[in-house]
Swiss-Prot record:
InterPro entries: Ribosomal_protein_uL29, Ribosomal_uL29, Ribosomal_uL29_sf. GO terms for cellular component: cytosolic large ribosomal subunit. The lineage of its organism: Bacteria, Pseudomonadati, Pseudomonadota, Gammaproteobacteria, Chromatiales. It comes from Halorhodospira halophila (strain DSM 244 / SL1). GO terms for biological process: translation. This is Large ribosomal subunit protein uL29.
């Protein structure tokens, strides 16, 4: 997911998306630990998605404080 796509979404949608990605990240970590995860690159993609979402949310919080 691109940061430009995330910036178009509402804050509530971003928070829900963050929750979903965190759940997915947890499930992938459990699969990796049990040896069931075949595509380990998925873990990195989800981690970067979480970082992008958090970045956009923090940008909005900073903008609110400055306004």
């Amino acid at each position: 997911m691109k940061a430009s796509e995330l910036r178009e979404k509402k804050t509530e949608e971003l928070e829900n998306e963050l929750l979903e990605r965190r759940k997915e990240q947890f499930n992938l970590r459990m699969q990796k630990a049990s040896g069931q995860l075949a595509r380990t690159d998925q873990l990195g993609k989800v981690r970067r998605d979480v970082a992008r979402i958090k970045t956009v949310l923090n940008e909005r919080k900073r903008a609110e404080r400055q306004a």
